[in-house]
């Protein structure tokens, strides 16, 4: 997404996504492409995207000032999510 100017990574969100076997680099790749983004609740955004290696990721993030985002969680898409994303 061209408007992203940076990511806010800290021990907490890196540890959280690593429990889902996802790396910060994968999240950045998935969001750098052409993800499907939906507005969630409480200022959150839900993004469905793909890494350069083809892995489908679901990411939840919040937008911060200056075009930076803080990832709250990320995981592999379910089969149902992949099917919807491909359409």
Model feature map: region roles:
Residues 1-87:
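Ribonuclease/tRNase effector modules and their secretory precursors
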């Amino acid at each position: 997404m061209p408007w992203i100017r940076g990511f806010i990574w800290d021990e907490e969100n890196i540890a959280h996504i690593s429990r889902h076997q996802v790396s910060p680099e994968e999240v950045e790749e998935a969001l750098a492409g052409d993800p499907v983004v939906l507005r969630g609740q409480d200022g959150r955004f839900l993004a469905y995207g793909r890494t350069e290696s083809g892995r489908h990721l679901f990411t939840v993030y919040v937008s911060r000032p200056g075009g930076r985002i803080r990832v709250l969680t990320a995981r592999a898409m379910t089969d149902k999510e992949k099917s919807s994303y491909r359409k």
